[in-house]
């Protein structure tokens, strides 16, 4: 009965233990990127730049000022996956009965004595304390089987922060200039411009996630680009474009079952939540109508996030 149960288990382990495709998913930067990461970072940047509303700049000569948050680093995930080879470890032992027979040599001793006409005869039988023959016989069958499962947990994450990658900044700057040109807007030097356009890149990096739910597992790599831009007329210092925020996220996902696969690979891009704090509500001093100037406490543009009581208290007291 046990043999019938073990045969399909061992066969399944043998077949499934070799099923799988490993695709390295490094964090942003930290060496040569692979194609999927390049595609995601470029897609999120292109979407964020393409979605900029530049209609108010039509027919103008603009000077671009682009500032980018440091975005380069490295990271690694170690461990955290199922160990399929552990399915054939541990043991159950069924030992057969063993019987051993020994044959010991025997010898006979005869002694004759004569004294005063009397004769005596003594015969003795002795056995040596060393077997001359040993025979071992086993009855029944023996077997050994095992069944187990090892879970590696969530694994360990290590990261390293480096300096800003100038090539990323240059690439993003070229994307912005390309969109301006395709929209019919002239990008000139600051000396010849009549409009200044400021673009702040707050988020330009990747997020890596690993999901482990026993039967279902997934590896996810996301790239996010979040920027805020506004335009100022040099002549009268008025805002042609008030501060606006664009945020897009590109994702690559591999789905596994017991870390075998991936049985499904998907890619996509979508708008994501905006900046936690933006400048859309800031006005020049004297233009706001309230009793107090706009503050971070009144910024509810980022739904789903709030400020802790301690953060609000420190802000009111003027603490950093």
From Swiss-Prot:
Chain residue ranges for the region called Disordered: 287-320
GO cellular component: cell outer membrane
Entry superkingdom: Bacteria
Compartments where found: Cell outer membrane
Keyword tags: Cell adhesion, Cell outer membrane, Lipoprotein, Membrane, Palmitate, Signal, Virulence
Listed transmembrane segments: none
Lipid linkage positions (S-diacylglycerol cysteine): 19
Lipidated residues (N-palmitoyl cysteine): 19
Main subcellular location of this protein, as a coarse class: membrane
Gene Ontology biological process terms in this record: cell adhesion
Signal sequence coordinates: 1-18
Family: Belongs to the MafA family.
Name under which the protein is recorded: Adhesin MafA 1/4
């Amino acid at each position: 009965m046990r043999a019938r149960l073990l045969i399909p288990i061992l066969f399944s382990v043998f077949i499934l233990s070799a099923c799988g495709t490993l695709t390295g998913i490094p964090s942003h930067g930290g060496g040569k990127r692979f194609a999927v990461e390049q595609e995601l970072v470029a897609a999120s940047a292109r979407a964020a730049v393409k979605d900029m509303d530049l209609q108010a700049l039509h027919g103008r000569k603009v000077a671009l000022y682009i500032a980018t948050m440091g975005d380069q680093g490295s990271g690694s995930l170690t461990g955290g996956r199922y160990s399929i080879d552990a399915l054939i470890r541990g043991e159950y032992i069924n030992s057969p009965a063993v019987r051993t027979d020994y044959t010991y040599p025997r010898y006979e001793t005869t002694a004759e004595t004569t004294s005063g006409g009397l004769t005596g005869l003594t015969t003795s039988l002795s056995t040596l304390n060393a077997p001359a023959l040993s025979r071992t016989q086993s009855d029944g069958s023996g077997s050994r089987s095992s069944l187990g499962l090892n879970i590696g947990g969530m694994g360990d994450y290590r990261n390293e922060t480096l300096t800003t990658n100038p090539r990323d900044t240059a690439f993003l700057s070229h994307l912005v200039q390309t969109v301006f040109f395709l929209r019919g807007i002239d990008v000139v030097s600051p000396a010849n411009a009549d409009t200044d356009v400021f673009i702040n890149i707050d988020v330009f990096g990747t997020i890596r996630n690993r999901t482990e739910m026993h039967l279902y597992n997934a590896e996810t790599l996301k790239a996010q680009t979040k920027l805020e831009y506004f335009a100022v007329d040099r002549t009268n210092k008025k805002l042609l474009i008030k501060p606006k925020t664009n945020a897009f996220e590109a994702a690559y996902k591999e789905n596994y079952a017991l870390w075998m696969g991936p049985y499904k690979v998907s890619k996509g891009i979508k708008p994501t939540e905006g900046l936690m704090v933006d400048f859309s509500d800031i006005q020049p001093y004297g233009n706001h109508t309230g009793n107090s100037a706009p503050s971070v406490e009144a910024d509810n543009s980022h739904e789903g996030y709030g400020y802790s009581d301690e953060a609000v208290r420190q802000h009111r007291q003027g603490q950093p």
